[in-house]
Amino acid sequence: VINNAWLTEMVSHALRPEIGAVGARLWYKNDTLQHGGVILGINGVANHIHRGIAKGEPGYFGRAILIQNFSAVTAACLVMRRDCFTSVGGFNEEQLAVAFNDVDLCLKLIKSGLRIVWTPYAEMYHYESASRGYDNTLEKIRRSQQEIVYMQEKWSKWLTSDPFYNPNLTLETEDFSLAWPPRLKRLPIN
């Protein structure tokens, strides 16, 4: 825990009736950012943005230091009301045993009319994959590939058009660089 008011900060957002889930700013032990929100479509399904930036850096247009809406946040530190969790069926543990169950949960919340908030004022250190391990065996790689296919089939429209990410930016990396070729086609002038 970095900020002792982390829970108060997260609960203050989660209690708002229009909010489905709240995520925190998570740091690696070397004080670089691990989680600053999730962007859909990056690397095929979703990825954390601002990964690796140093403490004190504002990120792309200040997004690493501003409370904002996202399509998803990590469940590594997630606060939500029980009624929100149960109303969308909770985590899909059958098809998403390890990866993307948090993204799936957040998308179900958005589909039900709720919003997802990320706050930089709830800060903690996160030891990524310490409990679940890495996808470094054939069995884990197969499971990971099945989870990717499931997400791409279920949420294909969302993964190509995240409303909280500029469509002029690439889905190949999480560095906010321009997409080339452009993801948006030229609009007719009529």
Predicted regions and their residues:
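Conserved donor NDP-sugar-binding/catalytic core segment of glycosyltransferases
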Residues: 1-46, 95, 115
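A general alpha-helical scaffold signature found inside nucleotide-binding enzyme cores
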Residues: 5, 17, 100, 104, ...
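A short, conserved alpha-helix in the catalytic core of glycosyltransferases
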Residues: 5-10, 64-89, 94-125
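Non-transmembrane alpha-helical segments in soluble domains
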Residues: 11, 37, 106-107, 148-152
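Phosphate/oxyanion-binding loops and surfaces in catalytic or ligand/nucleic-acid-binding neighborhoods
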Residues: 13, 17, 29, 112, ...
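Short glycine/serine/threonine-enriched helix-capping/active-site loop
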Residues: 22-25, 119-120, 127
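C-terminal, non-catalytic tails of nucleotide-sugar-dependent glycosyltransferases
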Residues: 30, 42-70, 79, 116, ...
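Short acidic (Asp/Glu) and glycine-rich catalytic loops that position anionic groups and cofactors
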Residues: 125-131
